Amino acid sequence: MRKNSIIFLLYLITFSAFGEIITSEKFSYSIDFPEGYEITDMEQDESTAIFKNKYLQAHALIRVWPQSKFKSADEALKDTLARLKASADYSESVWRRQKCSIASFESPLLLPDGTLSQGWAAAIPLPQKKGYLSILSYSPKTVYDDLAQVLISLLDSVLIDAGSFREPGLITTAFYPRKSPKNISISVAGKSIPSQIDSIDAEASQFVIDREFSVFSFYAANNLPEMYDAWIRFYRLLARDSMERVKKVSFDLYTFLLEECEKKDSANPQAALAQVLLNWSQDFHYERKSSSYDKADIESIPAILEGGSSDCDGRSLLLMCLLKNCSIDSCMFISAQYSHALLGVFLPDKQGQTIHVDDNEGGKDYIVGETTAKGLTLGMMPADMTDRKNWMAVELP
């Protein structure tokens, strides 16, 4: 996965996100922007940056305040919006073990032409006391209803540490706080394995699916150059949202299956575990969730674990999350040409069909897993889908 550092120079007036995770190394935050956002202005000390989407009337303002200036994120956000003469409704939410502030707002001072803007804002304490990160995501009020999903998606894509790459975002956490454990039973390899998810998980994940599909649909409907980056981002954000939700399930599966996997393949029990889970997914009930073009046809990961229907992308995404939680390097491959998805697992000693994924260290070859054809083992893929250039990787750090 590519990860760029923003260099805030006065002479640099445009920077294109293009589906990349944009990072400020100085303040230790990242944002997985929707496609098309560009920097239009910034301060040399990196404390302030303004973004505009080149396709949409969507804007973002980032301001990092010194830690000593405010006593809380709520105070930082209220001061930020007061400077902009904004009217706002505030709420607080604990995210990444920090009390954060969120607001919906309207302001007459954000847009160059003086028209009223509407949007969402958040303030988050940064690690190592590097300050309070205030982010405003907004549009002209006249088009807010059309762009609300994009604006919220941006705020929900803020990352402040390694752990936030693998748990629901701030907005989703605030809208769908944890409720209570929900017992589930997973039948795999002849075992009935008890586990738990949260009772809110399926509903919360569906919120993310619907929102991010709405964002992706804009790029697809207009056949924009960033369409495929937007598609990858769609799945990446679903994976990010799901990782923490299935963490206990991953642990329980690993605990119950490890001994048997070590007996099957003492030299490579990780490969044996991946194979067991692949066979398990091949027995799921096959069904696309929706046949409507304006709705995502992928079932949420928690709903699949509760017995819901699934197809290639939902299964591949599920296995990717489970295996990554078991510290097994994995990814998901998607193809527009083949209308299909595959699991990818990094198992250097395992023989079979692989797809190469580039990175800054020369790349890795991920062995593929076909989740919808019963009996196929790791390393086997449909004979009519072997052209590697037609596959794109969906990864998490």
Located regions from the model:
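Sec-dependent signal peptide recognition
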Residues: 2-11
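N-terminal signal peptide c-region/cleavage motif recognized by signal peptidases
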Residues: 14-16
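N-terminal "mature-domain start" segment
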Residues: 20-45
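Surface-exposed amphipathic alpha-helical segments
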Residues: 37-38, 135-174
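Conserved polar/disulfide-associated segments of primarily extracytoplasmic proteins
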Residues: 40-135, 139-141
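Secretory-pathway-linked proteins and extracytosolic
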Residues: 186-248
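Hydrophobic/aromatic-rich core segments of domains that either
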Residues: 267, 302, 314-397
